């Protein structure tokens, strides 16, 4: 057989090397992919599939990649630095596609409805709106940090899950809250009629199209591009300003934004308060009585958008706006944090006249539910509280606040309540109860409390007669152990002793007095629990007879060898001084003696103190 030429051998070797390197690269990529988060892996696989479908097409990151074995440049994709998710091109692209699909489905849904078709014809083409709204929604999603979304959910339940996406708005419109939605749209149409540059025809169009689902799109399409950008900003600001959600977040956000937009363009400030007062008396043409009640509620909510009902935005606007916003609602109705307005019946007024309340305590109680108001507005409220009938403030206090009491700070809440109680002996019952203060134990009628606080000093002549000396835990299943006189301890030890009541308690190294003056270690490896927890010093002392008969101290060499009989070492000649509880110990040891004689004669107990901690 002819020998294989040299060049062929080299070619084969090179091919083998290439195959090995390709295999190694594939293996490395597989490992890297397995360690990657799932979303990133999905992105890369999708991109590779796209590139594989059209091989000649240049990839955005790498050159051309064929569908065959991976190129050496392919690892550049895997090493690509992936920044914040909302800046990722692919995620943006996907989001835009999803939003366009959503919009198409919404438009189809709107076409099926007979009413608002005329309003749809007057709007700009769907293409323009599609360009506008995904950006608006995306920019809002990008601007809302996790903290703000958490704040948004701090409010009362019910509407927590409602976001501004039109799809969810559509679901919400089909739910039983449809009536309130319609009335809020009417009020929105009135608001926009007041805003600068609006014509009656436009507000009429808004009123006609109140059944349309994506309300935000209507608002955006009626603003110039600059204004719509400002409006998006206003939406995110509204998110920051309202940590407590109303019945519908979407409704209140659009309303707050619109009110603020009108207020900022300082032309209409004066007639705003008059309009608010007027709006409340307007009859609504085709709306049921229930709807008018809800409408008036939403109008009050608008009017208070810049008063001190818990909207922090008021702190950023001039104080006079807040004061003016309060005037229309003063004699009418007080809106609470939850957005529910409460009508006053004659019975309520009688109840108020029966128990009048000084305005200072009412003011304090108003602060305690966690209503966050600007300082100027708080002064305004204080001034109004003296002249105004007190039932308005009482109403604010009597409904429990939806904000968690931690907002007010439990200490401050308790202090305010104490002051209020000093001022007014019968405290208002419906106020949310303060967290119970950890005070002295209850009287001995309660068996649980007497067991928990057993031995705590309750003051002269209060409670059951207590034992002198330190406290000990009583386990009800066993007989009560005799109290051993020891160092008196502070009540802090009671708290330490209570949790471990059912467990077996081991003596710590501090509590064992070793005979013969051996080293007392800070912590023995046999000790369970830290010596700081138990302050008792149990001094163990043995009678001489028991020591002579029972205990052997084997020598070191015999222990190491473990061979032959273990030589006895004579016990320490000077046993420790007899202690007051020697007799008890002797009795116990005499009981244990036969057992000890049997067990310890055979093998001495070896305690290795050098074990690992």
UniProtKB/Swiss-Prot annotation:
The modification Phosphoserine is found at residues 54, 125, 133, 175, 195, 224, 368, 432, 490, 530. Isoform 4 is predominantly expressed in leukocytes and spleen. Signal peptide: none annotated. Residues 580-589 have a biased composition (Acidic residues). Keywords: Acetylation, Actin-binding, Cytoplasm, Cytoskeleton, Phosphoprotein. The modification N6-acetyllysine is found at residue 457. Residues 295-309 have a biased composition (Polar residues). InterPro entries: Phostensin/Taperin_N_dom, Phostensin/Taperin_PP1-bd_dom, PPP1R18/Tprn. The modification Phosphothreonine is found at residue 199. One of its GO terms (molecular function) is phosphatase binding. One of its GO terms (cellular component) is cytoskeleton. Residues 476-499 have a biased composition (Low complexity). Residues 18-231, 266-500, 552-595 are annotated as: Disordered. Residues 424-446, 567-578 have a biased composition (Pro residues). Pfam families: Phostensin (PF13914), Phostensin_N (PF13916). Changing residue 540 to G: Decrease binding to PP1. Complete inhibition of PP1 binding. Residues 18-33, 104-154, 167-191, 199-221, 266-282, 314-327, 340-350, 357-366 have a biased composition (Basic and acidic residues). Interacts with Protein phosphatase 1 (PP1). PANTHER family: PHOSTENSIN, TON-B BOX DOMAIN. This is Phostensin.
């Amino acid at each position: 057989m002819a020998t294989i030429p040299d060049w062929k051998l080299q070619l084969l070797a090179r091919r083998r090397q290439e195959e090995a390197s390709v295999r190694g690269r594939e293996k490395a990529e597989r490992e890297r992919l397995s360690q990657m988060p799932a979303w990133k892996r999905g992105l890369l696989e999708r991109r590779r599939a796209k590139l594989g479908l059209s091989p000649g097409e240049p990839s955005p990151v790498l050159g051309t990649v064929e569908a065959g074995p991976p190129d050496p440049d392919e690892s550049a994709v895997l090493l690509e630095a992936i920044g914040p998710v909302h800046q990722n091109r692919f995620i943006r692209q996907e989001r835009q596609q999803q939003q366009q699909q959503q919009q198409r489905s919404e438009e189809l849904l709107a076409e099926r409805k007979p009413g608002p078709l005329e309003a749809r014809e007057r709007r700009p083409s769907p293409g323009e709106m599609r360009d506008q709204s995904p950006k608006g929604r995306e920019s809002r999603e990008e601007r809302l940090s996790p903290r703000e979304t958490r704040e948004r959910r701090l409010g009362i339940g019910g509407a927590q899950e409602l976001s501004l996406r039109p799809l969810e708005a559509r679901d919400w419109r089909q739910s039983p809250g449809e009536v309130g939605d319609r009335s809020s749209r009417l009020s929105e149409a009135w608001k926009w009629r007041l805003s600068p540059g609006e014509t009656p025809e436009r507000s009429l169009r808004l009123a006609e199209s109140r059944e349309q689902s994506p309300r935000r799109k209507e608002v955006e399409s009626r603003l110039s591009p600059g204004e719509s950008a400002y409006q998006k900003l206003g939406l995110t600001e509204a998110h920051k300003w309202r940590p407590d959600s109303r019945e519908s977040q979407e409704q209140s956000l659009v309303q707050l934004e619109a009110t603020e937009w009108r207020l900022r363009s300082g032309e209409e400030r004066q007639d705003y308060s008059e309009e608010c007062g007027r709006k409340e008396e307007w009859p609504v043409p085709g709306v049921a009585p229930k709807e008018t009640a809800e409408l008036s509620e939403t109008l009050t909510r608008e009017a208070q958008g810049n008063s001190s009902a818990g909207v922090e935005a008021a702190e950023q606007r001039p104080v006079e706006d807040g004061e003016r916003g309060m005037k229309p609602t003063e004699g009418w109705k007080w809106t609470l944090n939850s957005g529910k307005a409460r009508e006053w019946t004659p019975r309520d007024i009688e109840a108020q006249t029966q128990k009048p309340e000084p305005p200072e305590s009412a003011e304090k109680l108003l602060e305690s539910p966690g209503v966050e108001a600007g300082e100027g507005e708080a002064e305004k409220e204080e001034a109004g509280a003296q002249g105004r009938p007190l039932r308005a403030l009482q109403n604010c206090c009597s409904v429990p606040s939806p904000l968690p009491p931690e907002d007010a700070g439990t200490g401050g809440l308790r202090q305010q309540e104490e002051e209020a109680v000093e001022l007014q002996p019968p405290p208002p019952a419906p106020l949310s109860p303060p967290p119970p203060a950890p005070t002295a134990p209850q009287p001995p009628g309660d068996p649980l409390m007497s067991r928990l606080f057993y031995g705590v000093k309750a003051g002269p002549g209060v409670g059951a007669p207590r034992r002198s000396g330190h406290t000990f835990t009583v386990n009800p299943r066993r007989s009560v152990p005799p109290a051993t006189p020891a160092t008196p301890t502070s009540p802090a030890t009671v708290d330490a002793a209570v949790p471990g009541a059912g467990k077996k308690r081991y003596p710590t190294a501090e509590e064992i007095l070793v005979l013969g003056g051996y080293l007392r270690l800070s912590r023995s490896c046999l000790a369970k629990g830290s010596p700081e927890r138990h302050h008792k010093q149990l001094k163990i002392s043995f009678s001489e007879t028991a020591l002579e008969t029972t205990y052997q101290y084997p020598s070191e060499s015999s222990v190491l060898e473990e061979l032959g009989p273990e030589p006895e070492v004579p016990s320490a000649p000077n046993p420790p001084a007899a202690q007051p509880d020697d007799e008890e110990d002797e009795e116990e040891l005499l009981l244990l003696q036969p057992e000890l004689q049997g067990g310890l004669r055979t093998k001495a107990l070896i305690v290795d103190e050098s074990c690992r901690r």
